[in-house]
Amino acid sequence: MSTICAGGQTLESKYGGRAPPQIQLPDRQWPSKKLTESPIWLSTDLRDGNQALPNPMTTSQKWQMFRLLVDIGFKQIEVSFPCASDTEYTFTRALVETPGAVPDDVSLEVMTPCRKETLVRAVESLKGAKKAILFTYLATSDNYRETILQRSEAETLEHVRDCIEYARAITKEDPEARQTEWSLGFGMEDFANARPDAALRLAEVIQAAWQPSRENPVILGLASSVEAATVNIFADQVEYFSRHLSSRETVCISIHTHNDRGGAAAAAELACLAGGDRVEGCLFGNGERAGNLDLVTAAMNCFTQGMETGLDFSNLPEIRRVYESITQLPVHPRTPYSGDYYFRAFSGAHQDAIRKGLQKRAANSSKSPWKVPYLPLDPADLGVSFDNVIGVNSQSGKGGVAWLIQNGLALSIPTQLAASFSHVVKEQSVAQERGLAAEEICALFADRYDLRDSPSGRVVREHGYIAAFQHPGCALELEDVTEQAARAAGILTRGLDFLLRCTRAASHPLGGPDDSNLTVAFVQCAVTEKAEEAWGIGIGFSQDSAIDRALLSVMNRHYQPTPIRAPLATNDSVIPRPEPIRGG
């Protein structure tokens, strides 16, 4: 049974004929190639990006965006559509005329329709610039040409020849304009749906009219204006075009992809394998409809393959903050590289794998290739804190909890303690009906194990015995005690409703700059009379004092005031000492 679409058409009759013209390329080369260097990057945030905003940028916001793009490292920036409004034209002139605004190695690009009167306006906006790209465009596919231009192919070719010759005359052949280094770009609108032979004929006309050179090639923009096919088809189209151009060495092929099917980044990458030299896009994928190519994604894909990109995203959170402030568009939390959740693992298995991977890397002095499971790159390379790597919810496990405690409190807790505390975290997450932030988990840990203040007790050790225990409402302090006095303190256990037996202990020095003389101890105790296990944590100036405080931490949580009736038992010790430290 055929699906019936809106308007009563069948699925096949409505969408079945949209496939681009078939290209016969049995010897295609791009599938066996590998990217080894980054393409030229063109930012069109101030043009394509700006026109797609519900509220286009003000002049001050344009200046802010331009400075951001320069700081990132873009060398080609499309800044305006001068014939659209006086605001666009004036902004371009301000860039040219403001001393020091445009670095000498940055080319200003403006876009304009392929008409003589608009070409003049665009050239006037750029006069005096050190490096300028005059970029014009025209529909290339039969559908766009017939629907929008209502011209034959022959009429279109003649129109383009006339306009490009005119552009050459008013730029690089004009004595007054020669102080600017002019380049020409021509965008083939809807190239992805154009007949290959028609696109090549247009390219030959443009080359003949502009007369490019190896040193100053003409830029031919191949646009997937509305993504309508799989990315391999676009790659075939680009390779066919590249291989059949005459004077290929005088042409820079520029790739302009859109994200209508979600394939902008993949289409651009495969197009570069197929012959693309430059890619066009916007920060975070801004642009009409589903957006243009996300330049952050494209650049970081190269970066994570070991390629120099020339772009600096080492403080990506700040770049994103400025971008969101200017555009009022939020970056989706799942956006590659830049989203809040890009690095974040909620799965317990993933968290444990990340923790182990980072420990292995640290053990290798952090000089080995990056191979941490589930982390595509080091968050620090984007200026992202490791606090953002682990997200804890009711699905998380002990590995993530241990990682957050280590990062937030500098405590390397034993695996068994992490497992025990993870149940507490899960209960809290379920109760709150949300995930818990790292700060909340650290606070919960500190509260549960008496880490906010010293344990509510005082310990004086003599010959390995705990000699005092204190709790609100029940206190005993013995100072300068002898071994006999310490044994006499056995009355405490007779006054409690439980007895502790230490079953596991571990410790490590604290690693902070102010903690060089401190040790933290983790003690697991069997709580008799209650048939349960409990953990205590203590910090002291020695391993013994840290263990004492850890034991007090356990006693404080389990103490229930009861009348003390037992007689003094001089041969009893309060708490059996733990086994030797065995680690976590």
From Swiss-Prot:
Consequence of gene disruption: Impairs the production of echinocandin B and the ability to inhibit the growth of C.albicans under screening conditions.
Entry-linked InterPro entries: AIPM/Hcit_synth_CS, Aldolase_TIM, LeuA-like_post-cat, LeuA_allosteric_dom_sf, PYR_CT
Catalytic activity: 3-methyl-2-oxobutanoate + acetyl-CoA + H2O = (2S)-2-isopropylmalate + CoA + H(+)
SUPFAM superfamilies to which the protein is assigned, alphabetical: Aldolase (SSF51569), post-HMGL domain-like (SSF89000)
Superkingdom to which the source organism belongs: Eukaryota
EC number: 2.3.3.13
Membership in a protein family: Belongs to the alpha-IPM synthase/homocitrate synthase family. LeuA type 2 subfamily.
PANTHER family per record: 2-ISOPROPYLMALATE SYNTHASE, PTHR46911
Name used for this protein in its record: Isopropyl malate synthase htyA
The species this protein was found in: Aspergillus rugulosus
Gene: htyA
